[in-house]
Amino acid sequence: NKIEHAGVHVHKSAHVNAPIIEEYPLTLECTVKSYDPATGILVGAIVAEQADEAILTDGVVDAAKLKPIVFDIATRTYRVVGDVVGHAWRDGLPLR
């Protein structure tokens, strides 16, 4: 059992047919709205969320505190999302 081997604790979601891993600082519970097997594109809807207070700033998830991990398929590695590289709705304004 991978869950037991990892040493994490789970409980059943009240909203979707999936386990909730209690040690995760952020959980987004989603339902599938559509899936295109030809492209692999999946569209989902978030139906519930749980966030640990430690990753929030003014009630909003703070990526710097969360330190999300992404999978890099090109190098088959996991990476931590890091530095700010731009500011939305501001940096592109001079290009108009």
Stretches with model-predicted labels:
Residues N1-R96:
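Basic, polyanion-binding surface patches
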